[in-house]
Amino acid sequence: IAGPKVLEHIVDTVLQFEGDQHYMYRILRSIKNRFGSTAELGIYEMRQDGLRQVSNPSELLLSQDHEGMSGIAIASAIEGIRPFLIETQALVSSAVYGNPQRSATGFDIRRMNMLLAVLEKRVGFKLAQKDVFLNIAGGLKVNDPAIDLAVISAILSSNMDTAIEPEICMAGEIGLSGEIRPVNRIEQRIGEAEKLGFKRFILPKYNLQGLNTSKLKIELIPVRKVEEAFRALFG
């Protein structure tokens, strides 16, 4: 294969710079590294004087005041080897132009459609005739399946027009049967949420096994099914 791939085979390290002209944040990923891990990631902010490293991205990516606003859920994500909190925003409304619209920014649209099917089939929420818009705040593209729980929580919150308590953070992958599957590096995810002052953390029940909770000040809410997460969030 001629072209850039030839150069990629010659060099020791390949870095990929991701970003968009409409957003201030840029992500630097390691695609190839012969002398270290490729699970490294750097987040930078574009300013007037150039790029500056973001030392604590969680604080910048979260809204300062979303209390009382429906359609917002906070997820604890892992990108590379660093945990950070992201704000998941959803808007659900009745379809007025015939075919319902599905749109996702910063999240895989096919995975969102799968999660909508799980909500309808397993939990009983009728969203087939609703427009659903999803956005990961800050212009980031997140591939971590652990934000599934926050995605469906934001969608349900918007559909019911009921806000999620602002001190709740969550992490969990959703399976096709509606089960909440365990996620990796749960200690780091919980620690990041606790550091930023969150009081409650919803997590897969399986992740409690072997987890040292004696020093944690944050309340852990283990769940096995989407229905249990729904009750924990909305009563």
What are these regions (language model features)?
Residues I1-G235:
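Peripheral, non-AAA+ core regions of ATP-driven protein-machinery
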